[in-house]
């Protein structure tokens, strides 16, 4: 199979990379009616599979789960999750032939074998759904021409898809129709109905393309969403220990600091996050972020270039063929890191203390978010897509670190994201360790700035505030956050 993106000519590549339209709410007036009375069969019952299925059923759709025969016979986790929630569960042969929409929500690595198994069983004119387009775009899987291929990609982990739905809301979602597989012209109607059934239409839906979703999703998760958080956690902890900060305190400051800092990001963008700092601390964080932006831009561009060209996917699939040797080795190395094994800290850390004593962490977030956004948009990805794949998802990933540190993050994210995370972090750690960490001390990580007063130069402060607030991600973010003002706020600090 050939990489689908690489089979397109330049004009087609740019057209698909740039496909992005924020859909009006009135386009979802009929909600999920288009799929009512039809049979939806989900393949796979992990976090996305279970939670999307629960939402779709609660929206009035007929949902069942097709699992491998051995998963049913051995009563594996997927079988238990589906059956204990009252769903009909059967083998591929039992359920696929009567399905109107087959939704493939298995891990990326399994997509080729799953599609190969289900496609011969699908009836003429059925639809095949994905929540990530890697199999279509990077692996180049070709689907039978009578089958409609659509995507609905919630921009958060599966657990949040369910929690926001239960609150009467939803999560921002990308939808797409594969241009090679829309024989009846009803792909968009199917995708809209599926998105509405999960609640996504209440939080904002982007009509995108398989190509744009894959290329932006891979970039976001490798760099700011996972890779930067992993690199920052390892480096900040090592620095604090070297400078005499209590190990338990250092571990807690990082573990819960990312979540607390990015909650401000979620509510008001980079502007709100930076405004939580004192004026001297804001200027210091800005300086550090600018230095990191210059230092790390080539690394961000390399990752985007490798994603666009397909080099990243080729390397990862080679590791799949090698029984995930690199993935497992990097996972083991992460588990052995000092931060992952930091002792517990029973003391309380006030919310503001995470900002005051985590100036370097704030700077890392600012630099990483802006670099990811800029690198995506200069590659032809539209600003709205770049926002969702950088700033928007960051608090959701930070929340996983708050639960069980980097282990939890790497368990929750996809296998593709985990591999890309290690690839980026393994390059970012030595780069930052050589050029940034020797220049900083406990004044920006572990303690706080030692200043006699909070006085700063007014002209400099005004200039810095203008730069922060006028960054393109702040402009598009203000509009998109307007659709998400009802999203749950998390408890921070403690």
UniProtKB/Swiss-Prot annotation:
Pfam families: KARI_C (PF01450), KARI_N (PF07991). Pathway: Amino-acid biosynthesis; L-isoleucine biosynthesis; L-isoleucine from 2-oxobutanoate: step 2/4; Amino-acid biosynthesis; L-valine biosynthesis; L-valine from pyruvate: step 2/4. It catalyses: (2R)-2,3-dihydroxy-3-methylbutanoate + NADP(+) = (2S)-2-acetolactate + NADPH + H(+); (2R,3R)-2,3-dihydroxy-3-methylpentanoate + NADP(+) = (S)-2-ethyl-2-hydroxy-3-oxobutanoate + NADPH + H(+). Keywords: Amino-acid biosynthesis, Branched-chain amino acid biosynthesis, Magnesium, Metal-binding, NADP, Oxidoreductase, Repeat. Mg(2+) 2 binds at residues 217, 389, 393. Substrate binds at residue 414. GO terms for cellular component: cytosol. It comes from the Bacteria. NADP(+) binds at residues 45-48, 68, 76, 78, 108-110, 158. One of its GO terms (biological process) is isoleucine biosynthetic process. Mg(2+) 1 binds at residues 217, 221. Binds 2 magnesium ions per subunit. The active site is at residue 132. The keyword Oxidoreductase applies. Residues 209-344, 345-487 form the KARI C-terminal knotted domain. Its EC number is 1.1.1.86. GO terms for molecular function: ketol-acid reductoisomerase activity; magnesium ion binding. Residues 14-208 form the KARI N-terminal Rossmann domain. PANTHER family: KETOL-ACID REDUCTOISOMERASE, MITOCHONDRIAL (PTHR21371:SF1). HAMAP family: IlvC (MF_00435). NCBIfam families: ilvC, PRK05225.1. Involved in the biosynthesis of branched-chain amino acids (BCAA). Catalyzes an alkyl-migration followed by a ketol-acid reduction of (S)-2-acetolactate (S2AL) to yield (R)-2,3-dihydroxy-isovalerate. In the isomerase reaction, S2AL is rearranged via a Mg-dependent methyl migration to produce 3-hydroxy-3-methyl-2-ketobutyrate (HMKB). In the reductase reaction, this 2-ketoacid undergoes a metal-dependent reduction by NADPH to yield (R)-2,3-dihydroxy-isovalerate. Belongs to the ketol-acid reductoisomerase family. This is Ketol-acid reductoisomerase (NADP(+)). It comes from Tolumonas auensis (strain DSM 9187 / NBRC 110442 / TA 4).
């Amino acid at each position: 199979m050939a990489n689908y993106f690489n089979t397109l000519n330049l004009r087609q590549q740019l057209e698909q990379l740039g496909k992005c339209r924020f859909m009006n709410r009135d386009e979802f007036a009929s909600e999920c009616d288009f799929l009512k009375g039809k049979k939806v069969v989900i393949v796979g019952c992990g976090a996305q599979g279970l939670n999307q299925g629960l939402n779709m059923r609660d929206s009035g759709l007929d949902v069942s789960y097709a699992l491998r025969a051995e998963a049913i016979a051995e009563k594996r986790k997927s079988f238990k999750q589906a059956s204990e929630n009252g769903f009909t569960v059967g083998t591929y042969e039992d359920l696929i032939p009567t399905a109107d929409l087959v939704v493939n929500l298995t891990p990326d690595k399994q997509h080729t074998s799953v599609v190969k198994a289900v496609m011969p069983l699908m009836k003429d004119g059925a639809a095949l759904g994905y929540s990530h387009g890697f199999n279509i775009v990077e692996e180049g899987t070709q689907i039978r021409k009578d089958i409609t291929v659509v995507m609905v990609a919630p921009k958060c982990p599966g657990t949040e898809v369910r929690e926001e739905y239960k609150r009467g809301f939803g999560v921002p979602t990308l939808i797409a129709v594969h241009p090679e597989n829309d024989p009846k012209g009803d792909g968009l109607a199917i995708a809209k109905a599926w998105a509405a059934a999960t609640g996504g239409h209440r939080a904002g839906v982007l009509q995108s393309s398989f190509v744009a979703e894959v290329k932006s999703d891979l970039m976001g998760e490798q760099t700011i969403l996972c890779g930067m958080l992993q690199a920052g956690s390892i480096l900040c902890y090592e620095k604090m220990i070297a400078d005499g900060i209590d190990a338990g305190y250092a571990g807690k400051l990082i573990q819960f600091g990312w979540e607390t800092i990015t909650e401000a990001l979620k509510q008001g963008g980079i502007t709100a996050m930076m405004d939580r700092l004192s004026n001297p601390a804001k200027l210091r964080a800005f300086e550090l972020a600018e230095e990191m932006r210059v230092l790390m831009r080539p690394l961000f561009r390399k990752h985007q270039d490798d994603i666009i060209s397909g080099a990243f996917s080729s390397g990862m699939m080679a590791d799949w063929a090698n029984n995930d040797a690199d993935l497992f080795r990097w996972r083991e190395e992460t588990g052995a890191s000092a931060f992952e094994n930091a002792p517990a800290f029973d003391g309380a850390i006030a919310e503001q203390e995470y900002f005051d004593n985590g100036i370097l962490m704030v700077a890392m977030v600012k630099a990483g978010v802006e670099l990811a956004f800029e690198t995506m948009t200069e590659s032809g990805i539209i600003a709205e897509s770049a926002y969702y794949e950088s700033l928007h998802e960051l608090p959701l990933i930070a929340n996983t670190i708050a639960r069980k540190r980097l282990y939890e993050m790497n368990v929750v994210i996809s296998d593709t994201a985990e591999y890309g995370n290690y690839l980026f972090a393994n390059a970012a750690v030595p780069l930052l360790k050589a050029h940034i960490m020797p220049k900083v001390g406990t004044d920006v990580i572990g303690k706080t700035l030692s200043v006699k007063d909070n006085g700063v130069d007014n002209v400099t402060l005004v200039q810095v505030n203008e730069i922060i607030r006028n960054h393109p991600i702040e402009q598009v973010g203000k509009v998109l956050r307007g659709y998400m003002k009802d999203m749950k706020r998390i408890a921070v600090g403690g």
